[in-house]
Curated annotation (Swiss-Prot):
Residues 224-282, 295-349, 353-422, 442-502, 507-562, 578-632 form the FF domain. Keywords: Repeat. It comes from the Eukaryota. The gene is prp-40. GO terms for molecular function: RNA binding. Residues 630-639 have a biased composition (Polar residues). This is WW domain-containing protein ZK1098.1. SUPFAM superfamilies: FF domain (SSF81698), WW domain (SSF51045). Residues 681-692 have a biased composition (Basic and acidic residues). It comes from Caenorhabditis elegans. One of its GO terms (cellular component) is nucleus. Residues 645-657, 693-703 have a biased composition (Basic residues). Residues 78-111, 123-156 form the WW domain. One of its GO terms (biological process) is mRNA cis splicing, via spliceosome.
Length: 724
């Protein structure tokens, strides 16, 4: 173990330590120190020893950087592990890749930036662009930060005039640093050997680990990339100075770049020539792109200039435009063929713009004119165009709008027609609403009048047999009747007839209800049934309240007629049976040779057991029949006929009495009316047919030659009178 503070005074070791100190100063940006004599080279640990089987944590050795190219520690990337890694493309431009997200970017991520870079990244960089002049007097622009050169003037950037060639001093310093890189590498290898020998002579001190061959290869590749980048910077600087162009060959370019220290960074001429040719290809492509962009920008500027120029009209010709804009820089910057194409496009644009503006003005005038018409109450749906024009000239609102005075007449007429149509539509809607209101009012009046009729019907004053003349004194005193007189449509009499007709149509239903009531009560209508008794039967039932009294009377008359008809039929049947028995009884008397001298007391014992005798009801009838037969058969027949005639006369009187009391059934009344209508229609049809036949015959006939004119004229008059 060496004691603390022990130092080696070997001159070789001191020299090696000085070289190492120089390299460290270059790496960390520290000022050089004169000597490290009397300073211990290594501080040995006193109470901790690294186990042989455990590798001591070491920091990777610094990259071999030539003098003058040292990287300040504050500018280097942080030592913390990151997902980002730095790479370079074929041109030597660095780019960054994230192995997790697979994202690639030209911009350095914040993770890889040093604290100084982070602090200055948000600050604006002023004066990046400088303007220089080429040998032929053409201006070009150089960025002092990105080392970019272009012909197109950058927009929105502050540009300063370049007084000296850009990056001259920096190029010299960097070139010197790169030139010394090879020598520094050799010195560094000697230092490593000396350090290894010194540490090997020390017992119990582990030797530093050998550098891996892969790291050495990476350092050499990185150094080669930096050397190539410096050589390309040389070419860019000379290009920006106008010394070389993309049309120069290698021999022409060497004359201008061989005196620069950066030219000697690369030893092989083939490498320099290869880099020069690659730079020519890349720069030629950039020049073409810049030229294309410059031409495109010039075209865009010219197009924008022409579109906004007030003299650009749809009718402007190219020759006239060339005379107007011949002195404009934007016009001169574009060749004639492109100018013509841009001019045609601008003419189309101006025509389209003017058309759109004209359409917008037209729509604005139409809307304004429509607003003026809507605000004028004098213009109605009846107003004509001539009247509207006179009213408009007197309107102050229209007089203030001078632009409307020059409005297209056809558009103005169209707007007026639309306004009139809208006014007519509104008028029709108002009229329809008023008509609906009147109809509702009239309907309410009719409904009130109908309620009046229904109230009369419920009281029994209005029935299906009621007459207008009988109820008019009652109806006319009501105000609802008076309201009906002041409105159009159906009159009070019409509604009365409709109501009565509805009651008559209800007769079938009322008749059915009456029959159901009589069946449920077990009542039967006979010829002697009184109407009061019949009405009590119906009204006393719960269903009887729905039956109309007039229909009840008609139904009563119908049932009475049926009962009387049934009684007549029974009487006729009885009379026929009686005549048949009398006939059989006469035959019986004839068999016993009864004559006018015969006595009933003598004949009776002889025939009392006979069927014809027994069929007679009593002895009075038998004796009467015997007397009739004894007096003669003709007398008997004549007596029965006289009885029948008397009965017929009685029946006729009853029918006439019922017809006087309006007791005829509705069915008989309707049948009579139908018969009358059929009879009248048949007679009318026959008369029409006869008249038609006569007229046809009169047209076909012609007066005979033998007839005199006077006779033919009399016939014609007679036919005309018959036709009339």
């Amino acid at each position: 173990m060496l004691p603390n503070g022990f130092s080696f005074l070997n001159p070789n070791l001191v020299a090696a330590a000085n070289i190492q100190q120089v390299l460290l100063n270059q790496r960390f940006g520290m000022p050089p120190v004169g000597s490290i004599a009397q300073v211990p080279l290594l501080q040995m640990p006193t109470h901790s020893v690294v186990a042989p089987h455990v590798a001591a944590p070491t920091r990777p050795s610094p990259m071999l950087v030539p003098p003058g190219m040292g990287i300040d520690e504050s500018h280097s990337s942080p030592s913390v592990e990151s997902d980002w890694s730095v790479h370079t493309n074929e041109k030597g431009t660095p780019y960054y890749h994230n192995r997790v997200t697979k994202q690639t970017s030209w911009i350095k991520p914040d993770v890889l930036k040093t604290p100084l870079e982070r602090s200055t990244s948000g600050q604006p960089q002023q004066g990046q662009w400088k303007e220089f002049m080429s040998d032929d007097g053409k201006p070009y622009y150089y960025n002092t930060l990105t080392k970019k050169t272009q012909w197109v003037k950058p927009d929105g950037e502050e540009i300063t005039k370049g007084e000296q060639k850009p990056a001259a001093k920096a190029a010299t310093v960097d070139t010197v640093a790169l030139a010394a890189a090879v020598q520094q590498k050799k010195a560094e290898s000697d230092l490593d050997k000396a350090m290894k020998a010194t540490l090997a002579s020390m017992p119990n001190v582990p030797l530093p680990s050998e550098k891996k061959e892969e790291e050495s290869v990476n350092d050499e590749v990185e150094l080669k990339k930096r050397q190539s980048e410096r050589f390309r910077e040389l070419l860019r600087d000379k290009y920006n100075d106008g010394k070389i162009t993309t049309n120069c060959n290698w021999d022409q370019a060497v004359k201008w770049i061989q005196n620069d220290p950066r030219f000697r960074i690369l030893n092989k001429v083939s490498e320099k020539k290869q880099l020069f040719n690659a730079w020519k290809v890349q720069r030629g492509k950039e020049e073409r792109d810049e030229k294309r962009l410059a031409i495109k920008k010039s075209k865009e500027d010219l197009e924008k200039f022409l579109q906004e120029h007030p003299k650009m009209k749809e009718s402007l010709k190219y020759q006239k435009a060339s005379d107007i804009f011949s002195k404009e820089p934007l016009w001169i910057a574009v060749n004639d063929e492109d100018r013509k194409e841009i001019f045609r496009d601008c003419i189309d644009f101006v025509a389209r713009r003017d058309k759109e503006k004209k359409e917008e003005d037209r729509k604005r005038d139409i809307a304004a004119f429509s607003h003026v018409l809507q605000s004028m109450e004098q213009i109605t749906y009846k107003t004509t165009w001539a009247q509207a024009q006179r009213i408009l000239y007197e309107n102050p609102q229209f007089a203030e709008r001078k632009d409307l005075h020059f409005m297209d007449k056809e558009d103005a007429l169209t707007v007026f027609e639309d306004h009139i149509k809208q006014a007519e539509k509104e008028h029709d809607e108002e009229k329809e609403q008023e008509e609906k209101r009147l109809r509702r009012q009239q309907r309410k009046v009719r409904e009130e009048y109908r309620l009046l009729l229904e109230s009369l019907h419920k009281r029994g004053e209005l029935t299906s047999m009621s007459l207008w003349t009988s109820l008019f004194p009652i109806i006319s005193t009501d105000t609802r009747f008076e309201l009906m007189l002041f409105q159009p449509g159906s009159s009070p009499l019409d509604l009365f007839k409709f109501f009565v007709e509805d009651l008559k149509e209800q007769y079938t239903e009322d008749r059915r209800l009456i029959k159901e009531i009589l069946t449920e009560k077990g009542c039967q209508v006979i010829a002697t049934t009184e109407y009061r008794e019949f009405s009590d039967w119906v009204v006393s039932h719960e269903k009887g309240g729905k039956v109309d009294h007039g229909n009840m009377k008609l139904c009563y008359n119908s049932l009475i007629e049926k009962a009387e008809s049934k009684a007549k039929d029974e009487e006729k049947e009885s009379l026929r049976r009686k005549r048949r028995l009398e006939s059989e009884f006469r035959n019986l008397l004839k068999e016993h040779n009864v004559d006018k001298d015969s006595e009933w007391t003598v004949i009776k014992p002889k025939i009392e057991k006979d069927k014809a005798y027994l069929a007679m009801e009593n002895d009075d009838e038998r004796e009467t029949a015997f007397n009739h037969y004894k007096n003669g058969t003709s007398g008997t027949t004549a007596g029965s006929e006289i009885l029948e005639k008397k009965k017929k006369k009685k029946d006729k009187k009853k029918k006439n009495k019922r017809s006087d009391n309006n007791s005829e059934s509705e069915g008989e009344i309707r049948e009579k009316e139908k018969k009358k209508k059929k009879k009248h229609s048949k007679e009318d049809r026959m008369d029409d047919e006869e008249r038609g036949k006569k007229s046809k015959k009169s047209r076909k006939r012609s007066p005979s030659r033998s007839e005199s004119p006077r006779h033919s004229s009399e016939k014609r008059k007679r036919r005309e009178s018959e036709a009339d």
